[in-house]
From Swiss-Prot:
SMART domains listed in its UniProt record: tRNA_SAD
Source species: Streptococcus pyogenes serotype M12 (strain MGAS2096)
EC number(s) given by UniProt: 6.1.1.7
Keyword RNA-binding: yes
Identification of the protein by name: Alanine--tRNA ligase
Length: 872
């Protein structure tokens, strides 16, 4: 068996299948495009579904690939086993209605055993097969495999409900008796016993039958076009061919582990408990590739998966003694390992590192905030004499602070407290139940009732007209089809229409319907797509309408043009975002209204004022450049070759519309647009905000609204100039700055006066010194305006040797503020305040020399002061 690097294994795989007439399908992005059924690309075949379902006919029915994939259904096992991973590479070869069983098995055996290729020893290979699949058994025998190396397994049959199905045959490598301490042998395979001796390296699925749940498998009908779908994990092949005990000791992971050794000062031992090393190495690979492919950490979906992976890796870093941000430092190593086939990680490493480091820093703050709350909870348990942290409190730490449950468990148990696991599960279930109950179904247009679903009449939208004559095909009133209607509201379908149905972020047209006399018989207030795709006009009926009659349909042209200004400007904005803040800023949603446009995009931080200025300037430059706007109908692949930027998550057919604005912007879009960018007139950003982790929103206006926005700003500036008595508008900023400086000086003077007053009052407070357990302390209630004054008292106290400990309490409004300061090592201010604060229904914490807390029960202030002697 050849000892090859992972890069050599990958390349040899692709070269072999190319020699058998296969074309190489490039590895796709981990984030699926136009496939809402998948969170991630999770296998080699996932990107080829379009070929297997017949929606796209491949130029070559023989395909091979090396596909990066992510699976997250078993995250907790990563690091515990030798072969679990979140991100992995699946090597595959596929036949779409071309070769079948004989070639798949023969060529597979050749690749594995030929001295020209992998050169596996034949006696180390074992194959499982479906018992009724005698053809596969016989084919393996024909290849020279000993019958004793063929194991029938009842589960070797692939099917998911009705549809394509078939037997599969798996190939295993025998690592020998050293990995079978109980000498169980082939029973490990036959009885599917978890083991480290027989390593599955390849699975060949023979898509042969059309599964029918109503009949036994023996009666399944054969498919007219049979397919081959195979998958071999690169990580497992590398482990076998490099003689590694686990996948983690291969060249895919060890360079990362070596870097973790340097960062932690700990040593990885292949025979020891190395879970934390493995978790970190695995998770940073997944994070690097996923972020490089456009996914960002967040609170839901893919973002939540990434956040969970990062936080799990950080916690394992802490177990290794790494308490500072460190994961981001591993990104270049991941890029170097994978550079030969996936150069994008190194190319984007600066961006990936920035995202990872930012998320690490956010999590560090989360840990700090959660730790303070947990400390308060544990202090309260101690004060109440309890020994168990309640599930509802664990859940609050998890839900409100984002504090990992496992960290809560670890810290609480280290402090000697038990954990209410069942209570936590109950609180979690209650939240899930509330979330499900809060789901509200959409309105009538969201429900495909039988009446709407029964509309089969054809209807065509005409892009390039504002008015046309068309025959009325369908009338629906009171949820029933009718031949005529004379009042109320109705839904109408015409043979053709100039009215755009709401789609792709563009709002629907409005307008009117006229009869042959020119009288308006209906007002169109909305247009949506019917279940079968026809534009469905919602109208207020003003006069009689009847099926089969021709009417003139007129849209509100002024409104359409205003919407088109915003839609075309949205395309310019998308391109400008790419140019100014980076190509990772991809569309996450949009709305093009008459009055404004709204654009949501992926980005990891607020867009700075300077960046917004550049974006706004660049969009206006393209408007003033008077770029010609063209639309082309073509297929998706040609659109990509034209440089189309995004698919917007829409489901497109074989023909798509490409909207091109000069040489500046190219996008797939089914909406309506202007003819020239100059028709937009003017573009103005009015707001930029965050709408969730990793997602930002820009709201902008165009044309008349943009002019109004600028004029409103000018009016506001004039008002400010008049208020500060600036002689000209350009002098207003300097006048405001001068007033601000003056105010700051007055505030400083006021603060100094307050300090002097506090110092005078402190003389009386500091006279009352008590002693307990050999510690001198002052405990007093003071009358102050804010918590800052308490700190001023403490600062004055520190200047002289009044006492060892200072405890001050103040009732400020409805709240109680408590301060503890300590000069002696015998009293920890942070710990002391945790014992005192609960007396006034408060919580708090701090450092050994200074701590503060807030409470709500002012009636217990005297009790708190009396308790000081017991707590010093």
């Amino acid at each position: 068996m050849k000892e090859l690097s992972s890069a050599q294994i990958r390349q040899m795989w692709l070269d072999f299948w190319k020699s058998k007439g296969h074309c190489v399908e490039p590895s796709a992005n981990l984030v699926p495009v136009n496939d809402p059924t998948l969170l991630w690309i999770n296998s080699g075949v996932a990107t080829l579904k379009k070929y297997f379902d017949g929606s796209v006919i491949p130029e070559n029915p023989r395909i091979t690939n090396a596909q990066k994939s992510i699976r997250t259904n078993d995250i907790e096992n990563v690091g515990k086993t030798a072969r679990h991973h979140t991100m992995f590479e699946m090597l595959g070869n596929f036949s779409i209605g071309d070769y079948f069983r004989d070639e798949a098995i023969e060529w597979g055996f050749e690749l594995l055993t030929s001295p020209d290729w992998f050169d596996f020893p034949k006696d180390k290979l074992y194959m499982t097969y479906y018992p009724d699949d005698k053809d596969s058994y016989n084919r393996w025998i024909a290849c020279g495999v000993e019958p004793s190396h063929l194991v029938p397994i009842e589960d070797n049959f692939w099917e998911i409900g009705a549809g394509p199905s078939g037997p599969d045959t798996e190939i295993f490598f025998d690592r020998g008796e050293d990995f079978d301490p109980e000498n169980i042998g082939l029973r490990l395979l036959a009885e599917d016993i978890e083991n480290d001796r027989y390593i599955e390296i390849w699975n060949i699925v023979l898509s042969q039958f059309n599964a029918d749940p109503a009949v036994p498998r023996s009666e399944y009908k054969e498919l007219p076009n049979k397919n081959i779908d195979t998958g071999a994990g690169l990580e497992r092949l590398a482990a076998v061919m490099q003689g590694a005990k686990t996948n983690f000791e291969t060249d895919l992971f060890m360079p990362i582990i070596r870097e973790v050794e340097k960062l932690s000062g700990k040593t990885y031992n292949p025979d020891g408990d190395n879970m934390s090393f493995k978790v970190i190495a695995d998770h940073i690979r997944a994070l690097s590739f996923a972020i490089g492919d456009g996914a960002l950490p967040g609170n839901e979906g893919r973002g939540y998966v990434l956040r969970r992976l990062l936080r799990r890796a950080v916690m394992h870093g802490r177990r290794l003694g790494i308490n500072e941000t460190f994961l981001y430092k591993l990104v270049p190593t991941v890029g170097q390992i994978m550079e030969s086939y996936y150069p994008e990680v190194l190319e984007k490493h600066d961006f990936i590192e920035k995202i990872v480091k930012r998320e690490e820093e956010t999590f560090a703050r989360t840990i700090d905030a959660g730790s303070g709350h947990l400390d308060s909870l544990l202090a309260q348990l101690k004060a109440e004499g309890k020994d168990t942290l309640e599930g509802k409190d664990i859940f609050k730490l998890y839900d409100t602070y984002g504090f990992p449950v496992e960290l809560t468990e670890e810290l609480a148990e280290d402090a000697g407290y038990k954990i209410d696991h069942e209570g936590f599960k109950s609180a979690m279930k209650e939240q899930q139940d509330r979330a499900r109950a809060a789901v509200v179904k959409g309105g009538s247009m969201g429900m495909q009732n039988e009446t709407l679903a029964g509309i089969v009449e054809e209807s065509r939208f005409e892009y390039d007209t504002y008015s046309l004559e068309s025959s009325l095909s369908v009338i629906i009133a009171d949820n029933e089809r009718t031949e005529a209607v004379s009042e109320g509201q109705a839904l109408l379908v015409f043979a053709q229409t100039p009215f755009y149905a709401e789609m792709g972020g563009q709002v629907a047209d409005t307008g009117r319907i006229k009869n042959d006399k020119g009288d308006t018989v209906a007002e169109v207030v909305d247009v949506q797509k019917a279940p079968n795709g026809q534009p469905l006009h919602t109208v207020n009926v003003l006069a009689s309408l009847s099926v089969g009659t021709n009417y003139t349909l007129e849209i509100n042209k002024e409104r359409r043009l205003a919407v088109e200004k915003n839609h075309t400007a949205t395309h310019l904005l998308h391109a400008a975002l790419h140019n100014v803040i980076g190509e990772h800023a991809t569309q996450a949603g949009s709305l093009n209204e008459e009055e404004f446009l709204r654009f949501d995009f992926t980005h990891f931080e607020a867009v700075s004022n300077e960046e917004l200025r550049h974006i706004e300037q660049e969009v206006n430059e393209q408007i003033w450049n008077a770029l010609t706007i063209t639309t082309t109908e073509t297929d998706v692949e040609t659109a990509k070759e034209m440089g189309a930027m995004a698919l917007f998550g829409e489901k497109y057919g074989k023909v798509v519309r490409v909207v091109q604005i000069g040489n500046y912007s190219v996008e797939l879009c089914g909406g309506t647009h202007l003819n020239n960018s100059s028709e937009i007139g003017l573009f103005k950003i009015v707001k930029e905000e965050g709408i969730g982790s990793g997602t930002r929103r820009i709201i902008a206006v165009t044309g008349r609204q943009a002019f109004e926005a600028y004029r409103n700003q000018e009016d506001a500036l004039k008002e400010i100039a008049a208020t500060v008595k600036a002689p000209q508008l350009k002098d207003a900023a300097a006048k405001v700055q001068a007033l601000s400086d003056s105010l700051r000086d007055l505030q400083k003077e006021n603060a100094e006066l307050k300090e002097k007053a506090a110092a005078a009052a402190a003389g009386d407070v500091f006279k009352d010194v008590q002693e307990a357990k050999g510690v001198r302390f002052i405990a007093s209630q003071v009358d102050v305006a804010d918590a800052g004054a308490l700190r001023t008292f403490a600062d004055n106290w520190k200047q002289k040797d009044y006492s060892d400990v200072l405890v001050l309490v103040a009732a400020i409004g409805e709240k109680v503020n408590v301060l503890v300061a300590s000069k002696t090592k015998d009293v920890h201010a942070g710990n002391m305040i945790k014992e005192l604060a609960p007396i006034v229904a408060g919580r708090g914490g701090g450092k050994p020399d200074m701590a503060m807390a807030g409470g709500s029960d002012a009636s217990k202030i005297a009790e708190l002061l009396a308790a000081v002697a017991e707590t010093v």
